[in-house]
A protein has these predicted regions:
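Formylglycine-dependent sulfatase
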Residues: 2, 16-455, 459-461, 470-491, ...
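Residues forming the ATP-binding cleft of Hanks-type serine/threonine protein kinase domains
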Residues: 467
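Sec-dependent N-terminal signal peptides
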Residues: 4-14
Length: 511
């Protein structure tokens, strides 16, 4: 509980009590969505190593983010606060204030070693870490650069998912003080756009035709904000950058970005890469596709490359778990796997994230539990990424500052079901105008309903009954018979904005 030390040691097994406290390995990927994780949804791919985490622990089936965008999501995780409180609201202009209170700083003060390896994406230099080794910005899939603690940049040879895992295992084995508990943040670049596969998996999934989502040809009727976006596979997915169709005479908006990325390959890998994708491009040109046929072709290329990137990720999660097992650390370590947000895999015809609609608002969250924490199977309580910070502090026996807005998940990990658990989730997306043209919006989600307000250069409310309309196609706001539900949701939305001290309430007051 907040402002109270959790007395863990009396309930720990003797070996853990002798050591002190649990270690924490926090594995976070980029844009990995629950639809592409077989313990959540096995229609598309198999992820046996990710599923291992859930099989030996828990799977949260109502897991959400506070702001579905990479940098802001990471800031929410580190601080336990919504974007308007931690100050990092968007990627376009956001700069993380590293002087503020963060969960790694608090754990460090409690005696933990803290390390982060991989994607940082918060602009400023990491603070609160005993060790860090990060990729600049989004990082690269092939032969990526890494920034060291002395601010020097080193180009590493290999595939980024392998390298981040190598560095993480090396830190656990060789660079930490093994007499002290630790928290290690393993932040992968995968599965971020533009989904460049590892060489050994170039040919994977090429014989697979992925099913087209039932909302793929959504016409956005009654949802002007959804219609205004610029993230449709058909019209917005870049033919070269995203689907790797290129030729000297083809110039697309992002083609130069693409050539910069593959220009990092050494000559041998570049030859293999070009041989594979040149054949794809030749086949594409021969087809002379247009209209829906072209859109569905781009969708299949997108799905195949995403699945290939994910296969390498799953391999490396397996390597991490195997190391923890072989090093005798599994029973004393909480292993957390999640993503910075969900992602659209063709639902509503989209790729990317940002919206409060389910596919990007929700995010996978599985945990392998150490000895002493007995919960197993599905956890249905609603959780959010602002809850990770208080959870880790609670697990470490460290005080939880009163200004942290999330709540500790530790009771759930013990197998408890608190009667006063939250019944709703608050969301606020801030980045507009920006890439993909998703309007600013905030909203509330309960078990059954979702109410959203799109604002700034638009003033539109949307209301969905998730029980009868899980695909969120039929906006019920203003419809006859919905007055009572709308009034109740408005009242609760206002209460949440007051609770979380969101200044948007002053600009758009709810009566």
């Amino acid at each position: 509980m907040k402002n109270n030390l959790l007395l863990l040691l009396p309930v720990l097994p003797a070996t853990l009590a002798a050591q002190g406290r649990y270690n924490i390995v926090y594995i976070m990927t980029d844009d990995h969505t629950a639809q592409m994780m077989s313990c959540y949804d096995n229609r598309y791919v198999q992820t046996p190593n990710l599923d291992r985490i859930a099989a030996d622990g828990v799977k949260f089936v109502n897991s959400f983010v506070a702001n579905s965008l990479s940098g802001p999501s990471r800031a929410c995780m580190l601080t336990g606060k919504h974007s308007h409180k931690n100050g990092f609201t968007n990627n376009e202009h956001g700069v993380f204030d590293g002087t503020q209170q963060t969960m790694p700083k608090l754990l460090r003060a409690a005696g933990y070693q803290t390390a982060i390896i991989g994607k940082w994406h918060l602009v400023t230099t990491p603070t609160g870490f005993d060790y860090w080794n990060i990729v600049p910005g989004q990082g690269d899939y092939y032969n990526p650069d890494f920034i060291k603690m002395d601010q020097s940049t080193v180009r590493e040879h290999g595939y980024v998912t392998d390298i981040i895992t190598d560095k993480s295992i090396d830190w656990m084995e060789n660079k930490r003080d093994k007499s002290r508990p630790f928290i290690l943040f393993i932040h992968h670049k995968a599965c971020h756009r533009n989904w460049l596969p590892e060489m050994k998996y170039l040919h994977e999934y090429e014989d697979v035709t992925f099913p087209i989502p039932e909302t793929f040809y959504d016409n956005y009727a009654g949802r002007p904000a959804a219609k205004a976006q610029e993230m449709e596979i058909g019209k917005d997915m870049d033919l070269t950058y995203d689907t790797k169709i290129y030729s000297p005479d083809l110039k697309t908006r992002l083609s130069q970005n693409y050539f910069n990325m593959i220009g990092r390959l050494d000559s041998e890998d570049r030859s293999r890469y070009d041989h594979f994708y040149d054949s794809i491009a030749a086949d594409f040109r021969a087809r002379k596709l247009e209209g829906r046929a072209l859109t569905e072709y781009k969708y299949q290329r997108y799905m195949r490359d995403y699945a290939k990137v994910l296969k390498s990720l799953d391999d490396n999660v397996g390597r991490t778990l195997d190391y923890l097992r072989d090093a005798g650390l599994l029973d004393s370590t909480l292993v957390v796997y999640t993503s910075d947000q969900g992602f659209y895999m063709g639902e509503h015809g989209w790729f990317d994230k940002r919206f409060m609609y389910e596919e990007s608002f929700s995010t996978p969250l599985v945990m392998r539990l150490p000895e002493g924490l007995k919960a197993r199977g599905e956890i249905r309580e609603a959780v959010q990424n602002i809850d990770y910070a208080p959870t880790f502090l609670d697990l470490a026996g460290a005080p939880i500052p009163a200004d942290i807005q999330g709540v500790s998940l530790l009771p759930l990990l013990r197998g408890e079901h608190p009667k006063k658990w939250r019944n709703d989730i608050y969301y606020h997306y801030h980045e507009y105008p920006a890439e993909h043209a998703v309007k600013r919006h905030y909203g509330i989600r309960t078990e059954r309903y979702k109410l959203m307000h799109f604002y700034n250069d638009i003033d539109v409310w949307e209301l969905y009954d998730l029980q009868t309309d899980p695909n969120e196609l039929h906006n019920l706001y203003g419809q006859p018979g919905m007055e009572k539900v709308t009034k109740q949701l408005m009242k609760r939305l206002k209460q949440l904005q007051i609770q979380y001290e969101d200044p948007i309430l002053e600009k758009y007051p709810i009566k």
